[in-house]
A protein has these predicted regions:
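Nucleotide-activated donor-dependent transferases that construct or modify glycoconjugates
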Residues: 1-10, 299
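Active-site and donor-binding regions of nucleotide-sugar-utilizing enzymes
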Residues: 5-8, 14-23, 49, 61-162
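A generic structural motif
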Residues: 27-33, 113, 226-230
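A nucleotide-sugar donor-handling region in carbohydrate enzymes
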Residues: 39-44, 63, 141-212, 316
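Donor-nucleotide binding loops and adjacent catalytic segments primarily
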Residues: 47-49, 184-273
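A donor-sugar binding/catalytic signature common to diverse glycosyltransferases
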Residues: 94-95, 106, 117-118, 145, ...
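Leloir-type glycosyltransferase catalytic cores
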Residues: 151, 314-358
Length: 358
């Protein structure tokens, strides 16, 4: 029986591992353990998240809680090493590009386990970004590089570090979750009509720390979107910063509907039925492409190029002229045509399990 350990480092990782767990459960040849790097009382892991995703809660919480990326790395390595003493794994699956992800990857390789990286090959090509360092380290160590698209697949293949590692373009596992839950989405109690609101999400620390740029973004949204409500489900620092900025603006911000996060299935409904999405999140941009909803990304880059080249996403960075132009197109219904990238078919988890068991 193949023993598989799945490591989640933050809330978004659970959205991607839930289909993996279903696929493993459907196999008679593998068992899994789900490990979370953080604390059991982590406020971002509301009970409704696991209920909405129809997945079990983690088997173990490593209990790491720090704002220092280096401290997180050290603490996760030590705690995960102790965990593997009692629960040896044949394969360790890590997700995305967090410090905790890198720490688990290093520990797994030192313990002699096979390492699989889910969403491998994503690059910003900015080595000053901590996540870019994490990606390079994880991919270099991985035995199985599971990529989501053509561009990331070519990057992972080109950078492959050893003959024993293999790259597989398995597709975008986020689509497995979206397709599975599409019929289960719930409309939030916000008095909204389909296609008659905008969705705003903000999370990137650099953007939130630049108060002048954030003020310009909020002002531009108010000035160019008429009477359309703007729903903004935010967490922690993003919530505090945006609420403060809105109260200090010289114009009315009453059109903003700011909420302290929102359950997963309700957020899925908001993404699927918005007139448009404004975000700094690659995952949210992917959801918008899946739903054929116009999306503006407030970054100069995206690790998910297919959302731009094939999908509904455009990049504006911090250029207010580009933001105004994109919002005008969004409001006027003049958005570009989009399609689904290759292998966004909802079968990614199935492919991964087949590869791991072959």
């Amino acid at each position: 029986m193949r023993q598989i350990c799945i490591v989640a480092g933050a809330r978004p990782n659970f959205v991607k591992v839930s289909p993996l767990i279903r696929a493993i459960r459907n196999s008679s040849e593998a068992q899994y353990h789900l490990v979370y790097a953080g604390r059991e009382e982590d406020p971002t892991l509301e009970t409704s998240l696991f209920e909405d995703l129809q997945m079990p809660q983690p088997d173990i919480y490593l209990g790491v809680d720090s704002r220092s990326l280096n401290e997180i790395t050290a603490q996760v390595m030590a705690a995960f090493d102790h965990y593997l003493d009692e629960h040896p794994a044949d394969v360790v699956i890590v997700v995305d590009d967090l410090a905790s992800t890198m720490a688990a990857a290093i520990t797994a390789k030192k313990r002699g386990a096979k390492l699989a990286h889910l969403v491998a090959g994503t690059r910003s090509f900015d080595i000053n970004m901590p996540k870019e360092i994490n990606r390079l380290v994880i991919d270099a160590l991985s035995d199985y590089l599971f990529t989501a698209g053509v561009r990331s697949n070519s990057v992972a293949t080109r950078e492959q570090q050893s003959e024993s590692s293999q790259t597989f373009m398995v597709g975008n596992i986020l689509m497995d979750t979206l397709r599975y839950n599409m019929a289960r989405l719930r409309k939030p109690a916000l008095n909204l009509d389909e296609g008659k609101y905008l969705l705003l999400t903000l999370n990137r620390r650099v953007l939130l720390a630049d108060e002048e740029q954030l003020r310009q973004i909020l002002m531009t949204l108010i000035e160019t979107t008429g009477d359309l409500p703007i729903v903004a489900p935010l967490r922690d620092n993003a919530l505090r910063v945006v609420v403060r900025q809105l109260t200090e603006l010289p114009v009315s911000s009453s059109k903003f509907i700011v909420r302290n996060s929102i359950p997963y299935l309700e957020f899925g409904w908001l993404t699927a039925h918005a007139k448009g999405v404004i975000t700094d999140s690659g995952n949210v941009a992917e959801e918008a492409t899946f739903n054929s909803v116009p999306c503006i990304t407030l970054n100069d880059y995206t690790e998910h190029q297919e959302t731009v080249t094939v999908g509904s996403n455009v990049l504006v960075g911090g250029d207010m002229g580009k933001l105004r132009s994109a919002l005008a197109d969004m409001m006027g219904g003049q958005w570009k045509k989009c399609a689904l990238p290759d292998r966004w078919d909802g079968r990614t988890a199935e492919r991964i399990v087949q590869i791991l068991l072959s």
